Amino acid sequence: MTARAYLCEGMDPDEAKGALARANPGAVVQTVKAGSVKNEFLAEMVAAQTLQAMESGGLLAKKPEIDLLLRLAGTTQISRAIRLEGSVNGGRFLVIVAGHMALTSPPGFTGAQLPRRLLSRSELARVEGAALLGAERS
C-alpha cells in the first residue's frame, strides 16, 4: 500500500484529481483543504484504513474517496466532512492518492509532495479516531 499527498496551487482541484486518477488507475484519489494534512505519513495511515475497508466491505460511504474524506474529517456525516476538510476552487489544496501499486505523477503535474515524518501524538490520535469511525459502524 502506498499513498502520496501533494500540495497544489494554481490549478483546479477536480482537474488535479482527474489527472492523478488517470495516471493511477484503480487508486483512490481525493482533494482536501490545504491545511488538512501536513505529514504524508498521516495521509498514508488514514488512506490505508480506507483501502482495508474497501477490501472488507466496511466503507463509511459508497465511494472510497468519500470514505477517505470522512476519516480525515473525523466524522461520518458527509456534509460536515465537506465543510471541515473539503477543497475549494481558487486556493491551495491537497490531493491524496493511494493504492496497492506504485504511484506516479502525470506529466506536467506541479503539486509539491508533502514531507514525510513520524507521526506526532496529535496525528496518531487522528489516525486512531479515523479507525474508530469504522468500529462504530460495525
Give each language-model segment a name:
Residues 37-97:
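Ordered, amphipathic secondary-structure segments that act as subunit-interaction surfaces
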Residues 33, 63-75, 105-109, 126-127, ...:
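Residue-level signal for functionally critical sites in structured catalytic/ligand-binding pockets
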Residues 2-59:
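N-terminal interaction modules that seed assembly of large macromolecular complexes
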Residues 17, 21, 79-82, 103-106:
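Generic detector of well-ordered alpha-helical segments enriched in charged/polar residues
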Residues 84-138:
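Glycine-rich, aromatic-bearing surface loops/beta-hairpins
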